[in-house]
């Protein structure tokens, strides 16, 4: 009889030990891992909640840990890198198609899968043990454990009066997920409503200098891996020799595509986006024929900020219709589409926006040829090669414009940068919000009448791009006064880090890696 009680006692101890391990794994999977100083109570409070649920009825406990397990299992690949849910993460959930999702999983470090496997084994063991622990055991141990842990967890509850941002995990995860989801849906509804609404643009004059205006939106290109900006390997030979204007200190508005392009391509008023007023609606208001050529995909019901603007253009060409196409489409395949747009015989000026897939992870998938490992590893070699490929694309595009024999001007910028991280294959890059280099991007303008290279050293922000766009197009508009984009004044550069607008100087540094020959 005593032997049987010892077995029950042993199983009870093991159950609570595994339950505490489960609370640690769950907190980590739900994004509570990025803090520099995570108190024990962050893990203990979840242990308290689950223990209480088993105290009332084991079935309630099993349901609770199952919900927590599934949430953390599926979120951990984002949670380890980005923390609690943000607007950028929610937008990615809605706006990522199946092909992009599969590509995303190929970039996940192997240790994430090891974590998921360990977490799954822990969950199964915990569930099995829960059927062998008597409810009386739950009661006597809960009384002692919960009393002790509530003391350690007091600081969690003390934050409740400060709104949604109390640090009570996992409630914080679900409350933030719900809040960000509502915010995203609200913004999406605004965009849908504004699609057919009249713009607020008030154009005072329009004096175009060129026949063809080409705006090229790049993807995930850090400027410090471009030889144009001093990287020792030749990654941008065309951009280095073309005459035009180069911003040496240009910053994206945000660290990933959706918020970055929203803050770049739309007009803002008192810090709020005016969803009817974007670069396409401005050009159309001026009588310019507009084209949108995209290799990013038209996602369908939950299409991106960029594709919504694109669909409002006079001519819209998505290389990946409806956003799901397993066939790889390379950026070069847009050049024949561009040629057709250039040859369309109209009297008005044209605005042709080209949205590249560029250097989007996974980098090797963006290239129509195999890449030898010549810089650190395969991933980093492909990243450099994707920059070369974009440079070659720009050179071919310029040749097409020259052959057209019409005045033209081209602007190229990237939507955001990337940050270094380590995976099972070594060093690579992915979107992040913690470093200056997540926002430090190239901006180049070259035209048919450019005579020299002009370098602008004064920092400029993509928050001001719409002012520069109007100036570039020769449009004088009532709301776009007071900012001389191409002759910037000294200013503090702010960026949106998914949660707040912060000074870029306050961010950490993540410099480019150099070849061994120049280290």
Swiss-Prot record:
Lipid bilayer topology: Multi-pass membrane protein
EC numbers, comma separated: 2.7.-.-
Transmembrane regions: 13-33, 40-60, 63-83, 107-127, 137-157
Stored Pfam families: Sulfatase (PF00884)
Uppermost EC category: transferase
GO molecular function: phosphotransferase activity, phosphate group as acceptor
Organism for this UniProt entry: Haemophilus influenzae (strain ATCC 51907 / DSM 11121 / KW20 / Rd)
Name of this chain's protein: Putative phosphoethanolamine transferase HI_1005
Cell compartments where the protein resides: Cell membrane
One BP annotation, GO: lipopolysaccharide core region biosynthetic process
UniProt record similarity statement: Belongs to the phosphoethanolamine transferase family.
Superkingdom per UniProt: Bacteria
Keywords: Cell membrane, Membrane, Transferase, Transmembrane, Transmembrane helix
GO cellular component term of the entry, any: plasma membrane
């Amino acid at each position: 009889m005593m032997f049987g009680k010892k077995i029950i006692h042993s199983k009870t101890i093991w159950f609570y030990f595994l339950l505490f391990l489960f609370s640690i794994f769950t907190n980590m999977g739900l994004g509570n891992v990025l803090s520099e100083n995570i108190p024990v109570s962050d893990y203990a409070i979840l242990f308290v909640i689950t223990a209480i649920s088993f105290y009332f009825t084991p079935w309630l406990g099993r349901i609770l840990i199952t919900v927590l397990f599934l949430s953390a299992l599926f979120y951990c690949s984002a949670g380890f890198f980005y923390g609690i849910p943000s607007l950028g993460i929610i937008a990615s959930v809605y706006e990522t198609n199946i092909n992009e999702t599969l590509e995303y999983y190929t970039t996940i470090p192997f240790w994430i899968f090891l974590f998921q496997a360990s977490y799954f084994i822990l969950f199964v063991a915990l569930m099995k043990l829960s059927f062998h622990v008597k409810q009386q055991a739950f009661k006597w141990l809960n009384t002692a454990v919960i009393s002790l842990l509530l003391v350690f967890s007091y600081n969690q509850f003390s934050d409740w009066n400060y709104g949604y941002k109390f640090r009570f995990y996992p409630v914080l995860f679900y409350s933030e997920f719900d809040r960000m989801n509502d915010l995203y849906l609200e913004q999406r509804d605004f965009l849908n409503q504004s699609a057919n609404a009249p713009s607020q643009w008030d154009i005072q004059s329009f004096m175009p200098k060129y026949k063809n205006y080409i705006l090229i939106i790049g993807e995930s290109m850090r400027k410090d891996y471009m030889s144009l900006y001093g990287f020792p390997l030749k990654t941008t030979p065309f951009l280095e020799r073309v005459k035009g204007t180069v911003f040496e200190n240009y910053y994206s508005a945000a660290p990933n595509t959706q918020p970055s392009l929203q803050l770049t391509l739309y007009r803002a008023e008192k810090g709020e986006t005016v969803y009817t007023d974007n670069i396409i609606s401005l050009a159309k208001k001026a009588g310019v024929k507009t084209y949108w050529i995209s290799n990013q995909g038209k996602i369908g019901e939950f299409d991106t900020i960029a594709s919504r603007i694109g669909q409002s253009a006079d001519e819209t060409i998505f290389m990946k219709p409806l956003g799901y196409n397993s066939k790889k489409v390379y950026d070069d395949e847009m050049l024949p589409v561009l040629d057709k747009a250039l040859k369309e015989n109209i009297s008005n000026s044209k605005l042709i926006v080209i949205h590249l897939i560029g250097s989007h992870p996974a980098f090797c998938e963006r290239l129509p040829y195999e890449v030898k490992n010549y810089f650190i590893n395969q991933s980093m070699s492909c990243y450099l090669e994707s920059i070369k490929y974009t440079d070659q694309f720009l050179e071919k595009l310029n040749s097409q414009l020259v052959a057209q024999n019409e005045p033209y001007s081209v602007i190229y910028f990237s939507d955001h940068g990337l940050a270094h991280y380590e995976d099972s294959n070594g060093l690579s890059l992915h979107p992040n919000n913690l470093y200056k280099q997540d926002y430090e991007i190239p901006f180049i303008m070259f035209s048919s009448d450019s005579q020299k290279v002009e370098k602008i050293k004064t920092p400029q922000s993509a928050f001001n791009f719409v002012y520069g766009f109007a100036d570039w197009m020769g449009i004088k508009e009532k709301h776009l006064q007071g900012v001389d984009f191409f002759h910037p004044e000294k200013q503090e550069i702010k960026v949106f880090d998914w949660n707040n607008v912060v000074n870029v100087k306050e961010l950490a540094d993540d410099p480019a890696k150099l070849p061994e020959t120049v280290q």
